[in-house]
């Protein structure tokens, strides 16, 4: 049976332990995701407290990280989602995503509604991918794919 968290504190504390053990053991997020049958981005988000992991995946990553049975249960619990308390993020990387939505949010909304109609793009039935590609002008570029199911508004 799945259980739900009533506070983000336990998952935040576990996320801090995950990051510390990951560093101590020299593991990458990909190392932790490998063999779970789940996407790198999903496993990373789960280990940072944003998703529940299936039992087999929770046991696998807990074993890699040296976590106990309580951590395995916690990794399977449904978290209180949302990792940006207090509104505007101060971390520069997260802020850039906030800034992108400040600049392009109304454009995305207009194009979604024009192409799909009145509704939303789900963040539950959702896939996220990130790839590093070479920039022809030098350096690297990040290609981020947000793939969410369109859910139309239904009058009632």
UniProtKB/Swiss-Prot annotation:
Q: Which Gene3D superfamilies does the record cross-reference, listed alphabetically?
A: Cyanate lyase, C-terminal domain, lambda repressor-like DNA-binding domains
Q: Which GO terms describe its biological process?
A: cyanate metabolic process
The enzyme's first-digit EC class, named in words, is lyase
Q: Name one GO molecular function term.
A: DNA binding
Q: Name one Pfam family in it.
A: Cyanate_lyase
What does the UniProt keyword field contain? Lyase
Spell out the SMART domains in the cross-references: Cyanate_lyase
Asked whether the UniProt record includes Hydrolase among its keywords, one would answer: no
Q: Which reaction does it catalyse?
A: cyanate + hydrogencarbonate + 3 H(+) = NH4(+) + 2 CO2
Its Enzyme Commission number? 4.2.1.104
Query: What residues form the catalytic site here?
Result: 96, 99, 122
Q: Which family does it belong to?
A: Belongs to the cyanase family.
Q: Which NCBIfam families match?
A: cynS (TIGR00673), PRK02866.1 (NF002773)
* Function description: Catalyzes the reaction of cyanate with bicarbonate to produce ammonia and carbon dioxide.
Give the matching PANTHER family: CYANATE HYDRATASE (PTHR34186:SF2)
Q: What is this protein called?
A: Cyanate hydratase
